[in-house]
Amino acid sequence: MRMGSKLAELIKKKNPDHDIDVVIPIPDSSTTAALQLAVDLNVPYREGFVKNRYIGRTFIMPYQEERRKSVRRKLNILDLEFEGKNVMLVDDSIVRGTTSKKIIEMAKEAGAKKVYFASAAPAIKYQNLYGIDMPATSELIASNRTDEEVAKEIGADWLVYQTLEDLIETCKFGNPQIKEFETSIFTGEYITPLGENYLQDLEVSRQDEVKAQREKAKA
């Protein structure tokens, strides 16, 4: 919930005269942040999506077309919560941008006047090396784009990311013994030594095109 409060502070600072009518989370991981964001902005909180819990995380699915189709299978939209409103959508993060773009498209189809987007995590710009099958860096939507360019790419009328400093502060709260955090996907600074060509080789191996070639070879 502290992440929601930090996002609210950032929104008030960047856009004090905002015209947000309603805050809606993209279920389920952003729900607590969205709820506190709505409280701190003093705007209504609504749940505008019904989630199909049998569809997994789209960003780790192997092919782009499969990811696009899975968004609509995963989320059913409640038009009444969007029609005629300026909506602030909240998600835990933006990885490839596939989910964000499709959800914003769905919100506008449902009649939203404007669709704003808040990410409870900072912009993800680098691949993960420590256990998460993240996309290649070149496939991360924020890897070579400004915030404004990401907003345009996903179709948002305005986009706000949590700052890394605020994220660290919220994670430290109540845990003063924790001094350091692994933040390489945001900063590109890895905590372990890497071979000269390791990142380059990993980048190539994680690209959709290379994955498709491997699957074809297995067939």
Task: Annotate each predicted stretch with a short phrase.
Residues M1-A219:
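PRPP-associated nucleotide enzymes
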